[in-house]
Amino acid sequence: MTDPNSKGSTSKEGFGDWCLLEADCSDVENDLGQLFERDTDSDISDLLDDTELEQGNSLELFHQQECEQSEEQLQKLKRKYLSPKAVAQLSPRLESISLSPQQKSKRRLFAEQDSGLELTLNNEAEDVTPEVEVPAIDSRPDDEGGSGDVDIHYTALLRSSNKKATLMAKFKESFGVGFNELTRQFKSHKTCCKDWVVSVYAVHDDLFESSKQLLQQHCDYIWVRGIGAMSLYLLCFKAGKNRGTVHKLITSMLNVHEQQILSEPPKLRNTAAALFWYKGCMGSGAFSHGPYPDWIAQQTILGHKSAEASTFDFSAMVQWAFHNHLLDEADIAYQYARLAPEDANAVAWLAHNNQAKFVRECAYMVRFYKKGQMRDMSISEWIYTKINEVEGEGHWSDIVKFIRYQNINFIVFLTALKEFLHSVPKKNCILIYGPPNSGKSSFAMSLIRVLKGRVLSFVNSKSQFWLQPLSECKIALLDDVTDPCWIYMDTYLRNGLDGHYVSLDCKYRAPTQMKFPPLLLTSNINVHGETNYRYLHTTIKGFEFPNPFPMKADNTPQFELTDQSWKSFFTRLWTQLDLSDQEEEGEDGESQRAFQCSARSANEHL
């Protein structure tokens, strides 16, 4: 061991002057009593708070902390599951920019069906995926034009897989109503219609405003409104157009592609759709030109016919059919349906559930009225009424020349015709006989046609009602009488041909007492030369047509046996036929008026 007092170098050498090598102990600081008795005025004198505590509003603080925590969790869920629509609306161009291509999400073919939690989350994620599409910003907000960039709308339309569905969705978003709720669908592009509803997407503002003036030369009524990127047109063209023609007009006028257009005809019998157009033109954002179409006015505008349109008047239908001389059910139904756009009662009939019942009853009533009117008329009044219904003028000489061509004395024929028309007993039947192709049927048919007579057919003789048409006419024709028919007439019809009363069996009625009307016969057999029918010789007046009917070089009849010719014939020979003057038919001072069968009030509107 070395000596500690030896003078060698040590590790503490050189620290003696400026560094304390040992701590100085003080006995004073070790006394705890003196330490606490010192002055307590120091920096940590208030470290312990011995004052009385208050409760405070700890419940409100806890509620605030819970709300902040819930809001934070909700924001995390929104960022995870909701689409970035809000960000896209702030900057759609920036959102459309992508540095890396999007990869399609892959679906697992065989997912594990364990607890269902993962499957539920996947389904929710798939349902939310279609909402990622960025909607275009409207270029004309608040029904007013704007100067937005239409390229945005083109891009949004091109990005959609179903362009028609996209346009319909944007239409409903803009106008608040579906496009199909205002229109009816035409599947064919060639079907013509005068009224069209056209919706156009992303139209330039200048072209949109100019179309309001340019379309006036093509349409009777225009309804135009633009909301956002969608423009809606109701066009009532002056002539019917198909969808292709309408698209060609719109594309050339608005400089748009056909894929930007939706076009269908409007619903004409939908009150809600009519109110949409009617109330829409009252706003400041819509433009309209021309009078309302009839289908809008009838459903929205109240008038003096509104109360009548809701109820059907059967008597008005019967009155219409009577004046138009319609007796068949099919003719009444078709013609009255065509009258619907002009007549309110026809519209009410179309809306009724018992249309067929009304048509049948209308035909019955018209037949009853016509039959009663015919029985009330004399033969002079009947002929006068029927020839006045013939339009046009002819010449009576054609009939006279044809009678003379058949070697018949015209004075004798005129005398027989006068007695025939007045139903003189034993002179009530005229027979025209001769070889075939002599004009017998043509002559007889022309007379029956102008006087609205009835034709009998012996083919129905097996029925006991085959003579029923004789009770519904003023003159009748039995064409081409053969031996079986002569035998039947000689057996059963002697009294009828004499002009006496007979009992006629009619369907659904008891036998009727009546006289046969003037009966015109045509036959190839001269009954006056047959001894078997000698009892008919005194009741039938016969005229022979021996010559063939003459024809011109162009195969047209040489003698025109038309309604106009018979009209001129009766007018010219009215006095010779002993027909009464129609001005002397009624009583003096009696007013002549048309037949009225409708329950029309005296104080109704004109």
Curated annotation (Swiss-Prot):
Region (Disordered): 581-606
Motif (Nuclear localization signal): 78-80
Binding site for ATP: 434-441
Matching InterPro entries: Helicase_SF3_DNA-vir, P-loop_NTPase, PPV_DNA_helicase_E1_C, PPV_DNA_helicase_E1_N, PPV_E1_DBD, PPV_E1_DBD_sf, Rep_E1_papillomaV, Znf_lg_T-Ag_D1_dom_sf
Compartment list: Host nucleus
GO-annotated cellular components: host cell nucleus
Post-translational modification, as annotated: Phosphorylated.
A Pfam family that the UniProt record links to this protein: PPV_E1_C
Region of interest: DNA-binding region: 146-309
Principal location class: host cell
Location of the motif Nuclear export signal: 90-99
Biased composition (Polar residues): 593-606
Reactions this protein catalyses: Couples ATP hydrolysis with the unwinding of duplex DNA by translocating in the 3'-5' direction; ATP + H2O = ADP + phosphate + H(+)
Family classification: Belongs to the papillomaviridae E1 protein family.
Subunit structure: Can form hexamers. Interacts with E2 protein; this interaction increases E1 DNA binding specificity. Interacts with host DNA polymerase subunit POLA2. Interacts with host single stranded DNA-binding protein RPA1. Interacts with host TOP1; this interaction stimulates the enzymatic activity of TOP1.
Matching HAMAP family: PPV_E1 (MF_04000)
Protein name in UniProt: Replication protein E1
Species name: Human papillomavirus 5
